[in-house]
Structure formats: structure tokens, C-alpha cells
From Swiss-Prot:
Keywords from the named record: Cytoplasm, NADP, Oxidoreductase, Queuosine biosynthesis
Binding site for NADPH: 83-84, 247-248
Role summary: Catalyzes the NADPH-dependent reduction of 7-cyano-7-deazaguanine (preQ0) to 7-aminomethyl-7-deazaguanine (preQ1).
Family, per entry: Belongs to the GTP cyclohydrolase I family. QueF type 2 subfamily.
A molecular function GO annotation: preQ1 synthase activity
Tree of life domain: Bacteria
Protein name: NADPH-dependent 7-cyano-7-deazaguanine reductase
Gene expressing this chain: queF
Length: 273
């Protein structure tokens, strides 16, 4: 289905009963073709981490239960899920009776797997689970005194490097883009680990800031950044992790790595989640 038929940016009615048809799928191949990424031979591994904060159902006695969920959609899935449709889908459980939280988890994972055409994993947690906030790992580059004047299309020509090999981790809280459909702002913290030619921090920060008025989905922004870095410095190793601020009861955190046996960064939330 074309993106114009999705519920993004439109007035919506919340369903009173569980409805899997609310989930709206978006083929990954469309945006990847734009980036020159071969969907049959991806240059990365990883997942999209979805944290959901509006999750409720009824137990067999009609008593409400509330919780939060974390779901992992593999990068090699055929489709992603449009975020507003996922929000409406989750809220369709509000008056739905389930035998247990495990049953709710099973239903959601099965539905997501069917829609994305991949094995989606995840877990649902009770609302009183203790949560600790973390901070981005690596060296923060945000305090550099730079002049910025490019806020249009992302400009990969801004990526410069030094002819010295390094293995390092850097981060920035200044990534911002806009939703492809609604133009609502997506605020992100990006953590980059790489081994290769040393990125020049000042020019790379300008590059990240050039996304400021870019209208793309979170997943496409992540893959654009990954691809641009790869093309610029041909690193021996590269991973990026973007933690987006919560919006509409959901935050989306894409992770991409050249390492097939990757380990996800800490699952501690950052302050904007």
C-alpha cells in the first residue's frame, strides 16, 4: 500500500477491540534503493529497537494491566511498521482480555513478525520495573565551536578525515530530522564506533547538523549516515546507534553494524526517552 494511505498525519479513531489490521507495513526496499543499498546484500547487520510506553490490556477478571514493551525488528526484515499504526494497534488491546502478560507478548510478537516478514523478538515489562538512565558512551563532540549554514538535504561532502588510523567511539546529541509524512521533529542521540581513518570532528558535526530539516524516517536516516561514513572512510569496523526521543508513546532506536556478531549497546534509556 502507498504511504499516502497510512494514518500518519490524519485524524484517527482508537479501536475498542484488538485489531491486527491496524498495523501498516512499509517496504524497506523503497528507501534503500534511494540510498543505493542492495537489499539482497546488505552492508550491515542490526535491529530497530522499539520501546513502547502505552501498553495495557484486561485480565480474565476485567482488571486493567499496564506495562511497557521493547521489540527488536531485524534489519533484514522485508518491511518496517509505520509508527502511528503501531501506536493505534497497541491501544486496541486496552479492552482486550488476555490470560497472561506472556500471552499478550506472544500475540504482539507474532503480529509484528507476520507484518515485517521477519522474526521479531522482544519482551513486555511491568510498569513498576526499575529503570536507570544512562549517558552516551564515547567522546561527545557537541561543544566544538563551528559555523553551520547547511540545513537542507544532508550533505555527505562535509565528512572529512585525517590520514591516521584510529579505533574510537564518538557521540552527539545534536542530530535532528523530521518525520517523512508529518514533518514532526525527531530528536536523536547518535553513538558511532569505528576503526579506520580518523573522522574530523568539526566537519562531521556539521554533517550531522545538516540533517536538521531532512524529512526521512528514523531508519532511513540511520542507514544514510552509516552508508555515508562507509563511503567516506571505508572503515574496517563501523557501528552506529541512534536513540530517538520518545514521541507518541514510542521511541525508535536503529542500530547498524558491520559485525555480524554484534552486541547491542546498553539498554539504559537516555534522558530524552
Amino acid at each position: 500500500m502507498p504511504l499516502s494511505t497510512s494514518l500518519l498525519g490524519k485524524k484517527s479513531t482508537y479501536k475498542d477491540s484488538y485489531d491486527v489490521t491496524l498495523l501498516f507495513k512499509i517496504p524497506r526496499i523503497n528507501n534503500r534503493n534511494e540510498l543505493g543499498i542492495n537489499s539482497n546484500n546488505l552492508p550491515f547487520y542490526g535491529v530497530d529497537v522499539w520501546n513502547t510506553y502505552e501498553l495495557s490490556c484486561l485480565n480474565k477478571n476485567g482488571k486493567p494491566w499496564v506495562g511497557v514493551g521493547t521489540f527488536y525488528i531485524p534489519t533484514d526484515s522485508e518491511n518496517i511498521v509505520e509508527s502511528k499504526s503501531f501506536k493505534l494497534y497497541l491501544n486496541s488491546f486496552n479492552n482486550f482480555v488476555v490470560e497472561s502478560v506472556k500471552e499478550l507478548e506472544r500475540i504482539i510478537l507474532q503480529d509484528l513478525s507476520n507484518v515485517t516478514h521477519a522474526k521479531v523478538t522482544g519482551r513486555i515489562f511491568p510498569i513498576n520495573t526499575k529503570v536507570e538512565f544512562g549517558v552516551p558512551s564515547g567522546k561527545n563532540i557537541d561543544d566544538l565551536d563551528i559555523v553551520c549554514n547547511n540545513y537542507g538535504a544532508p550533505d555527505n561532502s562535509l565528512i572529512e578525515y585525517e590520514d591516521v588510523l584510529v579505533e574510537e567511539e564518538i557521540n552527539s546529541n545534536l542530530l535532528k530530522s523530521n518525520c517523512l509524512v508529518t514533518s514532526q521533529p525527531d530528536w536523536g542521540t547518535i553513538v558511532i564506533k569505528y576503526k579506520g581513518k580518523k573522522l574530523k570532528y568539526d566537519s562531521f558535526l556539521k554533517y550531522l547538523i545538516s540533517f536538521r530539516n531532512c524529512n526521512e524516517f528514523a531508519e532511513q536516516c540511520a542507514e544514510r549516515i552509516f552508508t555515508d561514513i562507509q563511503n567516506a572512510i571505508s572503515p574496517d569496523f563501523l557501528s552506529i546507534y541512534i536513540v530517538y526521543a520518545r514521541r507518541g508513546g514510542i521511541d525508535i532506536c536503529p542500530y547498524r553494524s558491520t559485525d555480524k556478531n554484534y552486541t547491542l549497546p546498553s539498554d539504559k534509556r537516555f534522558i530524552r526517552q
